[in-house]
A protein has these predicted regions:
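Juxtamembrane/disordered regions of integral membrane proteins
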Residues: 3-134
Length: 134
C-alpha cells in the first residue's frame, strides 16, 4: 500500500512537472530564453541529461515533500521551499560563472522553479491521496 502510494505520487508529480515545464520552456518562454541566453542555448536540448534531471528532481520532491505531507498546503509550501533552494543554487551559480547569464534570467527562472515545484508537489500529493486511498 505504501509502495502504491509512492509510485502514484512519483508518476503524478513527474507528469505535473513535465507538463508545467514543457509549457513554460517549450511554448510560453522559449523565445524569451533564446533572446536572453543566445549562444548559451543548444538548438535542441540533450534528452538524456534532461530525463535524468527530471527523474532525480521529482524523486527528491516525492521523498522530501509529497510523501511526508499531511495536507496539500504543506506540500505546496515545502515544494516552494525545495524549488527556491534548488533553482536558486542553479541560477545563482550560473549568474556567478557564465557570461551572458543575467540577473533577469536568474530571477525569472528562479521564480518559475519555485512556483512549478510547489504546484507539482501539490498535484502529486492530491493524486496520491485520492488514487492511493491514503
Amino acid at each position: 500500500r505504501q509502495m502504491k502510494k509512492a509510485l502514484i505520487a512519483y508518476v503524478a508529480t513527474l507528469l505535473a512537472f513535465l507538463l508545467l515545464d514543457g509549457l513554460w520552456l517549450g511554448v510560453l518562454m522559449a523565445p524569451t530564453y533564446r533572446e536572453l541566453l543566445g549562444s548559451l542555448m543548444l538548438e535542441k536540448p540533450l534528452l538524456l541529461p534532461a530525463a535524468v534531471f527530471y527523474c532525480l528532481y521529482v524523486f527528491g520532491c516525492v521523498v522530501f515533500v509529497v510523501l511526508p505531507a499531511a495536507t496539500w498546503q504543506w506540500a505546496a509550501k515545502r515544494g516552494a521551499l525545495v524549488g527556491l533552494v534548488a533553482y536558486g543554487t542553479y541560477d545563482l551559480t550560473n549568474w556567478a560563472t557564465l557570461r551572458g547569464w543575467s540577473v533577469q534570467v536568474t530571477l525569472m527562472d528562479w521564480a518559475w522553479g519555485t512556483f512549478a515545484t510547489a504546484v507539482a508537489c501539490s498535484v502529486g500529493f492530491l493524486l496520491a491521496r485520492r488514487l492511493g486511498k491514503v
